[in-house]
C-alpha cells in the first residue's frame, strides 16, 4: 500500500508540465501547438525565448529529482524508489492534468538519475551534451544518452539485478519509444536541429496569444 501511494504521488508530481505552465506564465503559445508539438524544453526553445526553455528544463528535471529524493528521504526500500522513479517519469509522458499529452521525458529522466546516483546522472547528462554539441540534434542526443544510461549504471556502478537498475532500463526503453517519430525523421534527414525556429514560425509562431 505504501509503495502504491508513493507511486501515485510521484505520478502526480510528474504530471506537472512546466513547458505549458512556464509558457502560459510568460505569455507564450502552448508548446503543444507549434514546432514538434512536444511540451519540452527543446520545443519551448523554438519560441525564441531562452529563459522559458531554461525554466522548463530546470522544472522538469527538478520534479524527477524531487520524487526520488522524497522516497529516499522517508527511508523507502529500493523497490519503492524504483516504482517512484518510473511513476514520476510516466507522469511526465502522460500527465493527468494536461489530457495525457506529455513530453518525451529527457529532463525528467535526468532528474531521476541525479537523485538515484549523482554521478550516473552527470555521466548521462554529459553524454547528452557531447552528442548535442557535435550534432545539434536534441533527439539524437537523448537517444544516445538513453542507451548509455543503463550501461553506465551496470558497468560503472555495478548496479545489477536491483529494482532501481530495472527502473533505469525501463525509463530508457520508454524514452526511446517516445522518440520513435524522431528516429524516422533522423533517418529521413528531416529532423529539426537545436535552436531551429522555422517550424515554430510556420505553425503560426510561438510568441504571444497561445491558449493553454
Curated annotation (Swiss-Prot):
GO cellular component: plasma membrane
Keyword Acyltransferase: no
Biological-process GO terms, alphabetical: phospholipid biosynthetic process
Keyword check for Secreted: no
Protein name in UniProt: Glycerol-3-phosphate acyltransferase
Biological or metabolic pathway of the protein: Lipid metabolism; phospholipid metabolism
Gene name tied to this protein: plsY
Species this protein is from: Burkholderia vietnamiensis (strain G4 / LMG 22486)
PANTHER family, per database record: GLYCEROL-3-PHOSPHATE ACYLTRANSFERASE-RELATED, INNER MEMBRANE PROTEIN YGIH
InterPro entries (alphabetical): G3P_acylTferase_PlsY
Family: Belongs to the PlsY family.
Subunit structure: Probably interacts with PlsX.
Keyword vocabulary terms for this entry: Cell inner membrane, Cell membrane, Lipid biosynthesis, Lipid metabolism, Membrane, Phospholipid biosynthesis, Phospholipid metabolism, Transferase, Transmembrane, Transmembrane helix
SMART domains recorded: G3P_acyltransf
EC number of this enzyme: 2.3.1.275
Amino acid at each position: 500500500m505504501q509503495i502504491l501511494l508513493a507511486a501515485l504521488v510521484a505520478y502526480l508530481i510528474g504530471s506537472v508540465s512546466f513547458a505549458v505552465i512556464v509558457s502560459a506564465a510568460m505569455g507564450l503559445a502552448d508548446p503543444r501547438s507549434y514546432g514538434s508539438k512536444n511540451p519540452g524544453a527543446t520545443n519551448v526553445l523554438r519560441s525564441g525565448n531562452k529563459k522559458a526553455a531554461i525554466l522548463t528544463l530546470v522544472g522538469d528535471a527538478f520534479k524527477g529529482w524531487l520524487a526520488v529524493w522524497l522516497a529516499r528521504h522517508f527511508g523507502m526500500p529500493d523497490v519503492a524508489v524504483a516504482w517512484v522513479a518510473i511513476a514520476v517519469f510516466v507522469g511526465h509522458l502522460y500527465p493527468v492534468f494536461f489530457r495525457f499529452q506529455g513530453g518525451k521525458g529527457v529532463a525528467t529522466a535526468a532528474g531521476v538519475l541525479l537523485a538515484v546516483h549523482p554521478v550516473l546522472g552527470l555521466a548521462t547528462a554529459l553524454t547528452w551534451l557531447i552528442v548535442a554539441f557535435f550534432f545539434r540534434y536534441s533527439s539524437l542526443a537523448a537517444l544516445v544518452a538513453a542507451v548509455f544510461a543503463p550501461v553506465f549504471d551496470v558497468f560503472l556502478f555495478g548496479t545489477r539485478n536491483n529494482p532501481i537498475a530495472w527502473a533505469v532500463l525501463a525509463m530508457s526503453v520508454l524514452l526511446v519509444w517516445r522518440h520513435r517519430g524522431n528516429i524516422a525523421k533522423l533517418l529521413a534527414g528531416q529532423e529539426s536541429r537545436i535552436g531551429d525556429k522555422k517550424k515554430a514560425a510556420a505553425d503560426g509562431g510561438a510568441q504571444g496569444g497561445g491558449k493553454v
